[in-house]
Amino acid sequence: MLSAFLLLVGCSGDKQEKNMSITVNLRYTGVNGNAKKFAEEMVSRGTVDAIRAEKGNLRYEYFQSLDDPETILLIDSWADQEAIDAHHATPMMNTIAELREKYDLHMTVERYTAVETPETENKFIRK
């Protein structure tokens, strides 16, 4: 089933995804609005801005599901695996883990590697 998502937090600005970038989709699920509270606290603490400023970060955006108010989608894109590894080595990962525990969130993770859009698909893309 295809879920619809509503943008919850502004985009990371003028960063563009490049070939071979890695995008990680994390779905946070909780109860009583905890997933949204988690995302809001990530923003209010400045953690989101700090992640967006990290070398190699291309995108860090939260979206709220239109058909499941207890789910928040994080789209997190990086230039390469080295950038992800550097991010995972930062102290802010402890902050993120503590917030996940605070809000009792459960996660599913999907990981994608960017490739060029085939020419045959360009006719379906409205720019």
Predicted regions and their residues:
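Short amphipathic alpha-helical segments
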Residues: 34-58, 92-96
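Sec-dependent signal peptide recognition
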Residues: 1-2
